[in-house]
Amino acid sequence: MVNWAAVVDDFYQELFKAHPEYQNKFGFKGVALGSLKGNAAYKTQAGKTVDYINAAIGGSADAAGLASRHKGRNVGSAEFHNAKACLAKACSAHGAPDLGHAIDDILSHL
């Protein structure tokens, strides 16, 4: 069984190492990467990400809604393409299935 919380933690570590400016779009901006797991805002975001992954796996994810919310935060296709690459690395590291289709669904609404 996949530990999606661990996948998500590795995803965000990978994403913020590759694109540190992305962390500024979150409520935990300026928090050291090594301290993220102890930050309440990060825990909330990571939990939402795990919930979305579970919904995507179950076929009930609201890709249009997620895309719409992110557009309002000036997050577009470039960021999601970069996130897709980081998510693929995190999934691979944990033996998890590739979730590229979930990102593609979001991208189709941007």
UniProtKB/Swiss-Prot annotation:
Heme binds at residue 70. Keywords: Heme, Iron, Metal-binding, Oxygen transport, Transport. CDD domains: Mb-like. Residues 2-110 form the Globin domain. Gene3D superfamilies: Globins. One of its GO terms (molecular function) is oxygen binding. The keyword Metal-binding applies. Homotetramer. Self-associates in the deoxy state. Seems to dissociate upon oxygenation. Belongs to the globin family. Acts as an oxygen store capable of sustaining neuronal activity in an anoxic environment for 5 to 30 minutes. This is Neural hemoglobin. It comes from Cerebratulus lacteus (Milky ribbon worm).
